[in-house]
UniProtKB/Swiss-Prot annotation:
Conjugation of reduced glutathione to a wide number of exogenous and endogenous hydrophobic electrophiles. This is Microsomal glutathione S-transferase 1. It catalyses: RX + glutathione = an S-substituted glutathione + a halide anion + H(+). Homotrimer; The trimer binds only one molecule of glutathione. In vitro, peroxynitrite induces nitration at Tyr-93 which activates the enzyme. The chain crosses the membrane at residues 10-33, 63-96, 100-123, 129-148. The modification 3'-nitrotyrosine is found at Y93. Its main location: endoplasmic reticulum.
Length: 155
């Protein structure tokens, strides 16, 4: 079993950790952006969240949907669908001993695609911008999974 010093000396794992931190910070930004949009547009999903803006029927008018809020929320949900698999597969891939330059290409393309996807979603840019960014990031995760299965699980 590798000790902590060996793990910290693993350049691929350290690169993965750096890019994972960037992408998780971006995802946290979207969470904050959703809350910001809800507060500035006075749009809430739960009745108890409206309590500070009125009572009874008056509070219910804040219990609605808004396109700006929903757009940011959908971008955040899309991040959850893509970043979680990247984190799991990327960690296993990093520990499998891949070439540093190949791993960096995977990590950089994924992070770039996800940042571009967020820009394309929030701006909004016309399709196929968002779709291409999604599939590029998804393809990177599939590529890492394939390389991991091929090299370490002997499939």
């Amino acid at each position: 079993m590798a000790d902590l010093k060996q793990l910290m000396d693993n350049e691929v794992l350290m690169a993965f950790t750096s890019y994972a931190t960037i992408i998780l910070a971006k995802m946290m930004f979207l969470s904050s952006a959703t809350a910001f949009q809800r507060l500035t547009n006075k749009v809430f999903a739960n009745p108890e969240d409206c309590a500070g803006f009125g009572k009874g029927e008056n509070a219910k008018k804040f219990l609605r949907t808004d396109e700006k809020v929903e757009r940011v929320r959908r971008a955040h949900l899309n991040d959850l669908e893509n970043i979680v698999p990247f984190l799991g597969i990327g960690l296993l891939y990093s520990l499998s001993g891949p070439d540093l330059s190949t791993a960096l290409i995977h990590f950089r393309i994924f992070v770039g695609a996800r940042i571009y996807h967020t820009i394309a979603y929030l701006t909004p840019l016309p399709q196929p911008n968002r779709g291409l960014a999604f599939f590029v990031g998804y393809g990177v995760t599939l590529s890492m999974a394939y390389r991991l299965l091929r090299s370490r699980l002997y499939l």
